[in-house]
Structure formats: structure tokens, C-alpha cells
Amino acid sequence: MISSNDFRTGTTIELDGAVWRVVEFLHVKPGKGSAFVRTKLKAVQSGNVVEKTFRAGEMLPQAILEKATLQHTYMEGEDYVFMDMGTYEETRLSAKQIGESRKYLKEGMEVNVVSWNDKPLEVELPNSVVLEIKETDPGVKGDTATGGTKPAILETGAQVMVPLFLSIGEKIKVDTRNDTYLGRENS
């Protein structure tokens, strides 16, 4: 059990038979009446976001999530197959369960698979990944690092804005949390 006073961004709770993650929270102490906690919760399974208010100090069941580092081995139809490299046990996740993470997911990549009650819920990618540029406008002599940006499509199909001097075939580091270019990768 966790008190609503202990909510922090990222805290997970069980509510109505589902797992919810606290996205935002605000402790409110009005002049009259008792204090309360206004939250914005995101359903881990479906991605729905709701606003909910709890009394200050209200006790709620905390969802204990388990993380396992698995390797994405291959796709089978619409399912992504992950393998625990220690036990060689396979776990399958649907495209819906993976969500936006799939735009940076490539075969051979190690990720954290988050489970609740032995059911896989979502995939947590590393904060940054190295991917190759597959499609972009060609770089032109004179384009500088301080100039503008252009769209580039990466090997996984993700699109990010990159500096003008980059060209097809170069490997770049991308922040998976906010889809931004971090720099060239020397390989």
C-alpha cells in the first residue's frame, strides 16, 4: 500500500484492476476543508490518461512491476519476440503493447520488458540508440553544424530532425525519450 502523499512521477498504483502510472501530481491544501492530491494517471496497458483526485493520506495498492532485460530477436506476424538470454525463454508482445517504442526497436537490441503479475505490459528502451540514416536530403558543401535541420528516416522507420551536413549511411545517436538527434556515432 502507498499513501497518496507519497506519489511521485513514475509511481505505479493498482486501480480498478489495472496498473496506472502517475504522470503529474499536485498536493493541494485549500483554506477550508482537508488537503487532497490531484493527479494525472496513465494506464500502462492501454495508454489512456485520466485525471483523478485522492484525499491526502489515502492508501492505495502499489503495483509492483518487474523488469527483465530481454533481447529483441525477431518479428512473427504482428508480434515482437523477445528472448531472455540467460534462460532462452521467449516472450511475445503485440505492436499495441510496445506502442511508440517500436519506432526505435531493431533486432538484437536489449530492452527492459516490464511485467505485472507475470504479464508483459510494455517495453522500456535505452535512453539513446544508435541508428543508421536510410533516407534524407543529401548534404551540401558549406552546410554547417550551426545551421538548420532536415528530416531523416532511420533504419527502423523513425523520423528525426538532423543537421544539414549529415547524409545517408551515417550512424547517429538518437534520444528515444524525445526523438531528438544527439550526435554522430563513430564506429
Curated annotation (Swiss-Prot):
It is found in: Cytoplasm. It comes from the Bacteria. The keyword Ribonucleoprotein does not apply. Pfam families: EFP (PF01132), EFP_N (PF08207), Elong-fact-P_C (PF09285). Pathway: Protein biosynthesis; polypeptide chain elongation. SMART domains: EFP, Elong-fact-P_C. Its main location: cytoplasm. One of its GO terms (molecular function) is translation elongation factor activity. NCBIfam families: efp, PRK00529.1. Belongs to the elongation factor P family. This is Elongation factor P. The gene is efp.
